[in-house]
Amino acid sequence: MKTTLRIVTRMLPAYGVFPLVFSFIFNCLVYSGSRMIAGGWYHHNIETGLDRSLPFVPQFLGVYFGCYLFWAVNYILIARQERHRVYQFFTGDFLSRCICLVFFLVYPTTNTRPVITDAGLWNQAALWLYSVDAADNLFPSIHCLVSWFCYLGIRGNQKVPVWYQRVSMVIAVLVFVSTLLTKQHVIADVAGGVILAELCFCIGRKTELYRIYEKFGSRIEQKILEFTEG
């Protein structure tokens, strides 16, 4: 355990370890926990005519699945920033999941997925995805929320090349498209995820809320330092 933490603290500053790890854990708890609670409840379908007119393009699952690597890389980059920037970002990140949890429980949504009868790699991948990921917890889209956070968190950071900031924005937009063309989400889900990311990121940056998180995180940081240096 000590060796693992030492390796991690070579990649990340000690103050970035807890916010990053907790972000992942809390995201899983919100997504899985809300499904356990509200899975059997009535779910609203907020599809529009435009959503139904969009084609099903299973090849976009390459983007949909590939975004997990994008998330990992960018969240690590964000956790390597200055202390106050790290806590500002992850305060917004935490707040966004709290709001997602409220929506998932108060106004659970679903959508209509296509009936897949054709064979082929991408169609089989879509069938597998549909079998393991129920059509719930859709509004706002966490896929779109996190992808936009990946861009917001490095936007304007002088330590991150401008070209990569732009690439991150493009990847985030491609993720939005992938959620629609794989019929995992509808347009309202995408818009909700982006708006929520912008709102919570702004709250993290413009208010003093992050100091509460920083105060708590600093205690864990000290424990990490004592453990790895002891």
Which sequence ranges carry the predicted segments?
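Hydrophobic transmembrane alpha-helices
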Residues: 151-155, 197-205
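Membrane-interface loops
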Residues: 34-49, 79-163, 211-230
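Hydrophobic, membrane-inserted alpha-helices
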Residues: 70-74, 147-152, 170-178
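N-terminal transmembrane-helix/juxtamembrane module of multi-pass inner/ER membrane proteins
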Residues: 1-71, 126, 224-230
